[in-house]
Amino acid sequence: MSSNTVAQFATELKMPANVLLEQLRAAGVDLKSVDDSVTDSDKAKLLDSLRRAHGATDGKKITLTRRQTSEIRQADATGRSRTIQVEVRKKRVFVKRDPAELAAEAAAEAKAAAEQAAAEAVDMQPESVEAQAPAPQSVEALAQAPVEAVKPVEAEAPKIETPPVETPAVEAVEAAAPKIEASEAPAEPVQTQTAQAVEETPAPAETPEPVPAVKAEAEPQSAQPAASREQSTAQPVEPEAKKESVAAPKTQEAGPESVVHAQTDLNSKTPAPVAKSETAPSAPKAAQGRPQVAEAARPPVVNDRAREDARRAAEAEAAALREMLNRPRKVLRAPEPEPAGTNNAALSGTLHKPAGKKDAAAAPAAAPKKEGGNKPAAAGAGGKKVIKTAEVSSTWNDDASRKKPADKAAAPGGNSRDGWRSGGKGGGKNSRNGRNQHQDRRNESAAQEFIAREIHVPETISVADLAHKMSVKAAEVIKQLMKLGQMVTINQVLDQETAMIVVEELGHVAIAAKLDDPEAFLDETPGVSEAEALPRAPVVTVMGHVDHGKTSLLDYIRRAKVAAGEAGGITQHIGAYHVETDRGSVTFLDTPGHEAFTAMRARGAKATDIVILVVAADDGVMPQTREAIHHAKAAGVPLVVAVNKIDKPEANPDRVKQELVAEQVVPEEYGGDVPFVPVSAKTGAGIDDLLENVLLQAEILELTAPVEAAAKGIVIEARLDKGRGPVATILVQSGTLKRGDVVLAGASFGRVRAMLDENGKQVQSAGPSIPVEIQGLTEVPAAGDELISLSDERRAREIALFRQGKFRDVKLARQQAAKLESMFDNMGEGTQTLPLIVKTDVQGSQEALVAALTKLSTDEVRVQVVHAAVGGISESDVNLAIASNAVVIGFNVRADQSAKKLADNNGIDLRYYNIIYDAVDEVKAAMSGMLAPEKREEIIGLVEVREVYTISRIGTVAGCMVLDGLVRRDSQVRLLRNNVVTWTGQLDSLRRFKDDVKEVKSGFDCGLTLRGNNDLQMGDQLEVFEIKEIARTL
């Protein structure tokens, strides 16, 4: 009993092995894997199972496919030979009819024979092809047994060159079959290769599928109604026919379709064979409806003269086709450029057809399509639809004709958009004249004269875009940059200066420009200049050294207790408060005094009208006090000095005045313009005088701002809130900000969803000098960004995206420059890095902490801030820490549960801090631990050589006395002779009497040997020392 494996059986059946295995298991065959063997009985079980499942008792159709592959070499216009792969697939389909159905059809045939006998007898005489049909002479009789007509045709199909039965006209029409089939079934890739083989080889290749269809076209037009009716009847049946073959499911895809076409086109003589032959699986239902179909499908009787005329016309056309195909072939020549008015509709799509025969070939090919009556053929004859070689997606001529208008447009100006990306859609194998066109373009560009252009260079531009602007290849730009000493890639971003140098080196005129800058629209904001300016409250910033009492002073003014709730008792954010006093309203900005918050204080000075400089009476002028004075002077803001803590016994206001005079801050009593007010934040003494001086300064300044206008302001602080998203504290400087307004802040934009005042209460609008907290921005803006209210959200988005791209390009250009500069600096150095990820609660704290930590870097250990952002510590931060081996620092933020678990599993160090001092100190300690320890020598003893012995096995042994300290066996020693160091090394052994000892103390004698040195003399001294490692600190 023969057997093979499931995998081999699947290969024979041309189907996946796992699908076959499932079918065998469903049939009841117990198989474990595709490597198990399959017996004939198992195959029989599978066949029975499939027959039951598909409702068929016998195989109805067998398809045989033979494939042949060959190559054709053809020279093109440039003289290069081109190899073309040609694949010919020959297919035969045999259909077995059901005996019961044949009997029913024979009965129906006999019934209809009497009515149609005379007409059919006349039609059968002129043509020898119809000798293949059965004996009965009626339409219904031919409809009953179309398989007998199909089988002989299929049998003769491989011998198309010399058919024994067909007339010459039919043979010629058969040779043209691939073109007709191309319009009927444009989705079969197999017939593409077949059609190419027909036209590219001297003898026509076998194409059995379209043969019956071609015979039908040689017939008169009288069969059009019946053919169209039967075609619509046969189409729904095709899927059932495809299910019938179990052995070769994939190879049958073209089979049923070819049979449908063959039988449909035979209906020019026999109206209804297709429905009956293709609906064999559903015979009972089909048998009921056949009498009606036969009645409806009867064609009218046509006179013999019309048939004879149509046959002669078809013979003439077929003869012309045969003559054209038998002509000797010529070598393909490049087509001459056609004038603008030439009609390209008649061009053939075949690669190897001679150029001179295109028009001649198109006319005979169009005539049979008109005769056939098909819609696709009619469309092709009308010139509206391009007839392609076969079912291919595009023809070569199609691509060439598509390319011609573009070439004409590009040729006169010479400024083709191809540039370095030349090689458009038509290139490659599918382009008939692609190589010729590229060669012509190269010759054209070489012949063109150089044109100096004015190139507008933006702030940043990539190498590719710069080359495109100058209409040169990107390689030219890269080459020029290499000459200038810069290695770049095609996508690298260049800064404006470098790009302008390259443009000028290449002979063009460089113009620094900002093309299409959307920020130019911001200057056109209407309503600001027209609105009436009204008096506004002053914005007062409180500045000074840390712990000098700034927040406590504000607390007393606001009747609040903020300082008590702050971590470490120090301010680490900018606080904005609006206070209503008896003399009017004042907006206060409280800035941090710690040295790390320099940028925050600078922002506070820019946004303010008046600065209150707080100096402690017991402490005097300190570094941050001087820095605050410089910020105020740089911003051109008037100062009011508040000398705080005057209630303390050690307070000395006069010393403070003297120190401030040294800093160019002269009090009014000394002839200056700066008011000095002694205050106490604890008792409240002098607070009223301070507010009076502040409001007096505000009156002198005459502060005004438009109210009924679009809002403008500044971002004081920004943070990422887990529940509310990006939140920004802003100070409105002019106009009125309302809930629902579209705002733009730096590179972020959005619609104001909610506004809160400093007490957390909802407000609907905010006028000038009012601080509010807004929600609704797309991302966290940078502190210090300008905020503008716009009427159009689309414009706000456009400007924000432009700023983001600009910021990204500038950042990339800076990074590239920094990499190149630091590459050589760090080369050869053993610099260690401490990678950190910093997450803070607000933008300002992040800035300050990153600046303070980066400042700790030394030549040996460098702090590398891998990532710094606002918001809680998330899983993505921990993943980044895992990848970069970094320590995560959370400043006033915490990690969520998933991030904690991930950090614990991967050993990532999470550090939380509330005070900036602690974070800086711990990072400094970690960096100290990374420093290489300092090595120091420590002398622990002195030994004198009293006797020298030479022992053959050991060498020179010194008998010594320990004069000072001690000597250890693993110590290092220096040999001193006449107080001059002659050798440095280690002890080899140390003994006292006959015993090995670890150490010998002062006053005892011992014997010792030196490792690698036997040059010992009496009176030499040995200095014993140890090297100790001492930890270094920053």
UniProtKB/Swiss-Prot annotation:
**What GO molecular function annotation could you give as one example from this UniProt entry?**
translation initiation factor activity
Residue sites binding GTP per the record: 544-551, 590-594, 644-647
- Report residue spans for region: Disordered: 118-140, 154-446
Tell me the segments the record calls region G1. Answer: 544-551
Where do the segments described as G3 lie?
590-593
Which part of the chain is the tr-type G domain?
535-702
Biased amino acid composition, Low complexity: 162-178, 212-228
- Please list where the region (G2) is annotated: 569-573
Task: Give the signal peptide, or none.
Answer: none
Compartments reported by the entry: Cytoplasm
Note down the stretches annotated as region G5.
Answer: 680-682
Q: Which family does it belong to?
A: Belongs to the TRAFAC class translation factor GTPase superfamily. Classic translation factor GTPase family. IF-2 subfamily.
Q: Entry's NCBIfam families? A: IF-2, small_GTP
General function of this protein: One of the essential components for the initiation of protein synthesis. Protects formylmethionyl-tRNA from spontaneous hydrolysis and promotes its binding to the 30S ribosomal subunits. Also involved in the hydrolysis of GTP during the formation of the 70S ribosomal complex.
- Protein name per UniProt: Translation initiation factor IF-2
What species was this sequence derived from? Bordetella avium (strain 197N)
- Gene it is expressed from: infB
